[in-house]
A protein has these predicted regions:
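C-terminal His-loop and adjacent cap/lid subdomain of alpha/beta-hydrolase
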Residues: 1-598
């Protein structure tokens, strides 16, 4: 439960700017202080909570950063909470959903993009859930206790993986998730790909949380460095689930929450992108969508680009920032059978929308959300779940994505799926508040041939289009500290394509339905990264030729669209259909039509 919320800063948001009929917003920053009874049934599933130090009341204490954006006049808001789960301490709502520039500290309205959630009148809430999340630049963190064995340090041999230049900049040294109990016996190896043999590497400890290669050497770009060492001081990470649960429940149901928000919220929705979406899947699966009194926390949950993943979190010495793709983070526990969303809900009737892109089918086993584990038949979703596929889109797709090749073989995918996500967020809100059902699920299916094995995808014959060897495996989790060959693997499937190489099923936004090129959710690395390996998150865009080319079997732009007016008419038809199906908001429809004029 929450014992106090201490507000340390309260100010007009972005200079008192107004957002439609809702008007101005206030920003409140502070700390939520909570404590948990380890014996309470709602908390017993938290790993090592029984090994955490206790307060004078016999409870386990925690402190979470919290940020609230509330209408300055609460009665002009819609009376509902939209809680965004942060991604490694970062808020993504404005930068991704809204097409803005903001990180955690927006300063101007330009940082907020279209500011849709504010114009809709939501009270926005963020809080810390990961003790390892960086707090720099306004990052949101959580303070939890260190577990011990009756006061003695817990020490365990664990494994960590580091790769320079793929998910971030070049690494000069490696920062460990945990403190090394001893430097003795630690072993560092390197391999170029997941299947290559490990080779020992000389290294040294800089301090108990940092290692580097021997003086004069730097990590090879893209190679997999693996450290095995004796770690100590594991925090009780699973408290993060309880912190989210208790903060939202407190804001919804307590007098303190009413005073902070200016009114009693009627409903609460949760939204999470990537890691944050996987966190929400795990939050549901582990039963944390009911508070200690059994009251539902979130009435609606929206996960975007989570695939079938959960988070490596409620485990001793867990590392929640890890996520498996073709080249990275194999052997860490992230997936857990059963995968289908209906199995996560544990009888909870919260309404769920899940959206995934092409990348999640190639890299994150997303097909297993709606097929049997062997990939032989489609499985129906429960009545309170909708699933939507965003074809021709990469994992991090949003407005303003780069179009050059970057670290990849092909030019990167710039398709923006967020117009559909915005429409579906509105649909989830309507579903929760007044029972208006959202559009039917739009997913690739085995039955109609739009979901197939990777080797059955009918790619057009292009010299520049070299498809992946396979989709990434989905395997049974084992001992993550010393992985062995998996005991079982499930069968992920991927979306089938048309003659242009564009995927057939799902919500085909105008750039896919009336294409000027081929969009995929995958790309391949080029040197100096491991050449030919499936890139971590990047997709591909291969533009059509302007006029007929003997080297390109795809019709040229001139053949498809004899006049600009013909192109505009086709865009208008697609926009009208998407609006009719409630998959495109009016403002986004107008923007699509305006772009088609260019």
């Amino acid at each position: 439960m929450i014992t106090a919320i201490e507000i340390t800063s309260r100010a007009p948001f972005v200079g008192g700017a107004t957002f439609g009929e809702v008007g101005a917003y206030e920003r409140l920053d502070g700390v939520a202080i909570g404590e948990l009874d380890p014996a309470h049934p709602a908390n017993r599933g938290i790993v090592n909570i029984d090994k955490a130090p206790r307060s004078a009341h016999g409870n386990v204490e925690y402190r979470s950063d919290i940020c609230i954006l509330r209408p300055a006049d609460p009665e002009r808001g819609n009376g509902r909470i939209l809680y965004e789960v942060n991604n490694r301490g970062r808020t993504l709502l404005f930068a991704n959903l809204c097409g803005g520039k903001a990180g955690n500290q927006p300063q101007t309205t330009a940082d907020l993009g279209n500011a849709l959630p504010l114009r809709l009148g939501f009270t926005l809430v963020w809080s810390g859930w990961d003790p390892g999340a960086p707090r720099a630049n306004g990052g949101l963190g959580l303070d939890t206790p260190i577990a011990t064995d009756n006061g003695a340090p817990i020490v365990r041999r664990i494994r960590e993986e580091f790769i320079s230049g793929t998910r971030g900049g070049e690494l000069q040294q490696f920062r460990l998730n945990y403190e090394a109990a001893t430097q003795d016996g630690a072993v560092l190896t390197v391999r170029r790909t997941q299947s290559a043999p490990r080779q020992p590497v000389a290294f040294e400890f800089v301090d108990a949380r940092t290692v580097r290669l021997a003086q004069g050497t730097r990590p090879e770009l893209g190679s997999i460095y693996e450290l095995r060492y004796d770690a100590t001081k594991p925090r009780v990470l699973g408290i993060g689930f309880a912190a989210t649960r208790d903060i939202v429940s407190h804001l919804r149901n307590s007098a303190t929450g009413r005073d902070l928000l200016g009114r009693q919220p009627t409903h609460a929705l949760a939204f999470g992108i990537s890691q944050a979406g996987r966190y929400l899947r795990d939050h549901l699966a582990q039963g944390f969508n009911r508070d200690e009194d059994g009251v539902r926390v979130f009435d609606g949950v929206f996960t975007h680009v989570a695939g079938i993943g959960r988070v490596f979190f409620n485990t001793e010495f867990a590392q929640p920032a890890r996520t498996r793709t073709w080249h990275e983070d194999h052997g860490f526990p992230e997936v857990e059978f059963p995968f289908a969303t209906g199995e996560l809900l544990r009888g909870d009737d919260t309404k769920v929308i899940e959206t995934n892109t092409s990348t999640e089918y190639w890299q994150k086993g997303a097909s297993l959300l709606h097929t049997d584990p062997d990939g032989t038949r489609d499985v129906a979703l429960p009545a309170n779940v909708r699933g939507y596929y965003l074809p021709g889109t990469q994992h991090g797709g949003k407005a303003g994505m780069p179009r050059d090749a970057g670290p990849c073989t092909n030019p990167r995918n710039w398709h923006d799926p967020m117009p559909a996500i915005r429409a579906l967020l509105v649909a989830l809100d309507e579903w929760v508040v007044n029972g208006r059902e959202p559009p039917p699920s739009r997913l690739p299916r085995i039955a109609d041939g739009t979901l197939v094995r990777a080797e059955a995808v009918a790619w057009p014959k292009l010299a520049s289009l070299v498809p992946p060897r396979a989709a990434d495996d989905v395997v049974a989790p084992g001992d993550w500290t010393d992985p062995q060959p998996p005991s079982h693997a499930w069968q992920p499937l991927v979306p089938q394509v048309d003659a242009d190489g564009n995927e057939i099923a799902g919500i085909r936004l105008p750039d896919i339905a009336v294409p000027r090129g081929t969009f995929t959710g995958w790309n391949l690395y080029k040197a100096p990264l491991p050449e030919g390996e499936l890139a971590d998150r990047d997709g591909t865009h291969l533009a059509f030729a302007t006029t007929r080319s003997p080297d390109d079997p795809r019709p040229s732009l001139a053949e498809r669209y004899p006049t600009h007016e013909a192109y505009r008419e086709r865009i208008a038809d697609v926009v009208a259909e998407l609006q009719h199906d409630r998959l495109l908001l009016e403002e986004d429809a107008a923007a699509c039509l305006a772009r088609a004029q260019d």
